[in-house]
Amino acid sequence: MPGIKRILTVTILALCLPSPGNAQAQCTNGFDLDRQSGQCLDIDECRTIPEACRGDMMCVNQNGGYLCIPRTNPVYRGPYSNPYSTPYSGPYPAAAPPLSAPNYPTISRPLICRFGYQMDESNQCVDVDECATDSHQCNPTQICINTEGGYTCSCTDGYWLLEGQCLDIDECRYGYCQQLCANVPGSYSCTCNPGFTLNEDGRSCQDVNECATENPCVQTCVNTYGSFICRCDPGYELEEDGVHCSDMDECSFSEFLCQHECVNQPGTYFCSCPPGYILLDDNRSCQDINECEHRNHTCNLQQTCYNLQGGFKCIDPIRCEEPYLRISDNRCMCPAENPGCRDQPFTILYRDMDVVSGRSVPADIFQMQATTRYPGAYYIFQIKSGNEGREFYMRQTGPISATLVMTRPIKGPREIQLDLEMITVNTVINFRGSSVIRLRIYVSQYPF
């Protein structure tokens, strides 16, 4: 009949067995012993067990058991004959009547397949593929997996089942990635910080050696974990972009780097000296060249070469003016017998000296003293001429000596001529006379 399943009637034989050590017989599960007939009769569990089947399931009694099937399941009940069960031939209690083969009526029992199975054309129970027939209860977020006699609802990778729903698993919460993790529905993806590359396992990160792959630095590249550092050669400094190097102007760091002039060059610097000087081994200090000693001057034979700081001076022979007479290369004398010498210094001595520009003051630069000391005489020292700027003064240091003191720094180049006078006073013989040192001071251009 279309739409109705055929139910095959079956006969279940109940066995009546003696109880060990007891003459009383026992029946198999699902049957009960009828003491009057001595036969094992089926127990109707649908009547004796409360709520044997629950919900939309109905209870169908079977010989020796029962089935729970959907109430909407159509059942065809065909007649079948139930053979007699074989009686137990062993001893019985004396009160029991003699056993005889009872007559069972012909009953109709349905053959029903268990839930999840269906009858095929050969009246065999075969599994129902609920997934293929779309008769499952899995929701769209789940996957139906057929099993023997049923099915299961499962979730795809990256989801887990919670209260009948497939919820995305946040893999990033469990530290699947070594560095950066991005959760996506049903999966996740790992990425790395700048300076790293993702390994083949898709999870761990490996440092990128930027110096070996691209060498972004202009000069020296030093690889670090996850990055790199650019370094510059000596004499260069790293620019703000961290990649390029610019020349370092060492000369701008300090004015004392070189004694004279600092010359900057790409990556370095050097010190230079003005003409008349040479650079010392420390590569910063300048030393005067003695042109007179090395005969590297332009003085003629009549002139005297006088070395100065950074140069030289060709000094002409002295000329003694009337009434003075030249008595040596640097001395003029006024004869006492000459009436014109009465109020003039007895001698004029020519001396030369040099000082550096900007010399610190006060500074003792020249000493003057009497060569002969007469009884009853005393001496007075003074600057007779040339000190209009009040840059010097005479300090008497003893009865017959005095020192010329420079009181103000003098910037060169400059030439100064001072007449230093020593006055001799002798009260015993009522004598007063004087001598002069004509001092020529050459101030150099540089302070060294």
Swiss-Prot record:
Motif (Cell attachment site): 54-56
Residue stretches making up the EGF-like domain: 42-82, 127-167, 168-206, 207-246, 247-287, 288-333
GO biological process, one term: protein localization to cell surface
Reported modifications of this chain: N-glycosylated.
Residues with attached carbohydrate: 283, 296
Protein family: Belongs to the fibulin family.
Protein name: Fibulin-5
